[in-house]
Amino acid sequence: MPQHTPSDRWFTVEAIDADTYAISEYAHWEEPHCYLLNGDRASLLIDTGLGVGQIAAVAAGLAGRPVIAVLTHAHWDHMGGLRGFPAFAAHRAELDWLTGQFPLPPAAVRAQLNDPRLPAGFDLDGYRVFQGRPARLWRGGETIDLGDRQLQVLHTPGHSPGHVCYWEPAAGYLFTGDLIYLGELAADFPSTDPQAFLRSVRRAAALPVRRILPG
């Protein structure tokens, strides 16, 4: 059953299994989902949401240890909470958007972020898109080792040039970001490559997936 975390009621936490949690922002029209994975040696947060609440504190409370953050892609609604994670990882093809060349002007992002359900006191006018250099740049094909859990980094371009999915073969979990989600898959953004998008979806469809966990 979904539970609001006591440390930040903006987020809803749902247990996927005993060591995997969805951290969602259902109060915003985007409804982004991030995922906290606990291994016996390390914990991983896939995406960091809008940057409205303190997702770093929520993740640390679920993990009980420092958390590694990784991105599926560098869109504002997936990287907003990265200020709580000085060292994070993303694909190298997203680097320009992370270090000063984000394509949307601040006013356009704030217009998309605006929602009547934002927390009281949230400074919408002061909101800025996260900018920062990753501590690690993916190429695709890397393995993330959490001890008793391993994930593979799959480069799945299309939604954005450096979009990646995270594949956990032992569990059959595929964390898909904005490659696959419920509803119509939008492929008409300026940064979207429809042909690459289709190839990436077909690649994902060929995996022995037991559960898709979208962003």
Segments from the language model and where they lie:
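Conserved beta-strand hairpin/beta-sheet module of binuclear metal-dependent hydrolase folds
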Residues: 9-61, 165-181
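Short Gly/Pro-enriched turn/cap motifs at secondary-structure boundaries
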Residues: 25-26, 127, 133-135, 155-157
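Active-site micro-motifs of SAM-dependent methyltransferase domains
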Residues: 22, 77, 95-96, 162, ...
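Active-site HxH/HxHxD metal-binding segment of metal-dependent hydrolases
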Residues: 50-145
